[in-house]
Each structure stands twice: as C-alpha cells, then as structure tokens.
Amino acid sequence: MMQALGQGHIDADTYAQVLRRHHRLLAGFEEQLSDWLVTLVGSGWQYRRRVPALREDLRVLGQPVDAAVPPPASSEAARWGMLYVIEGSQLGGRVIARMLRKRQPGLAHALHYFELADEDPAGWRRFQAVLEQRLQSAAARADAIAGAQAMFAHFHTCLAAEARP
C-alpha cells in the first residue's frame, strides 16, 4: 500500500486508509508525549503537530478518525530517537503530495498532512543539528537508537494492520 502511495497509484478509499493508519500512529505519539513535545522549543526544536492536518484530510474525505495507538515511552534520549523517525518520515511527504497531485488530482483537497514538509524545507538539517547537541554521550546515542528502533516497529504495526474497534 505504501509503495502504491509513493507512486500515486492509489484510490480514494485506500488513501483514506493510509491517513487513518498514520493518524493512529501520530495521535498516539502526540497525545502520550504532548508535555515533552512542548518543551522541545527550549532545546532549539519546535515540533509541528501532524494530527490536525490528518484530521482535516480525513474530514474532507468524509472518513472516521481511528483511535490512537501510543508508542512505547522511554527515556528522553529514546524519545529523541522516536522523534528522529517521525521527522524523517516527513521527508517523503513532499514526493507523495507531488505524485498524488499529478496522478490523483481528485485527492488534491486532502493533502494537508503530506504537504506539511513544504512549510519548512530546511527543517530536517536543523533537526539533525539539534539532535547532535542533545545526544552527546554514547549512552544517550544508544538510547536514541533503541527509541528509533521502537518507533520503526510502531510504524510497522500501525501501518500494516487495520484498526480494531
């Protein structure tokens, strides 16, 4: 499904399913770590919430919002690793939005989530610089790697399975 999305070969129902799965994943992350995400400004990074854009896209498509699935929470360094995965996943959003506009123009009104990356094209480089500053010890880097691996597994779980009521 994700490969078809990246190539723009996806119908509206499947696209809505992708958005619902992303919502499950990101709503869980943003709800569980909401307080921590607000403190990131003091570290030099401002997290841009994705859930409002996802909810808007789902609303436009007339789709329900699936329940949030929180990721495993851990140390602050592990949270930075989790955030690394989320911020990195945004990079492909531009490509996906561009491809869908070209191949599925009927979905152009529901691309708010994937177009978030366009708001700050240099953001990834800035995030990497902040990450370097926050993870200076070998132990912090090891925890961040564990957090990133946990978030990759969480992505896989949320994107691969249908939501259960």
Swiss-Prot record:
GO biological process, one term: heme oxidation
GO molecular function: heme oxygenase (decyclizing) activity; metal ion binding
Keywords carried by this UniProt record: Heme, Iron, Metal-binding, Oxidoreductase
Pfam families on file: Heme_oxygenase (PF01126)
Catalyzed reaction equations: heme b + 3 reduced [NADPH--hemoprotein reductase] + 3 O2 = biliverdin IXalpha + CO + Fe(2+) + 3 oxidized [NADPH--hemoprotein reductase] + 3 H2O + H(+)
Keyword Iron in record: yes
Superkingdom of origin: Bacteria
Cross-referenced CDD domains: HemeO-bac
Disulfide bond positions: none
Protein name, entry field: Heme oxygenase
Source species: Xanthomonas campestris pv. campestris (strain 8004)
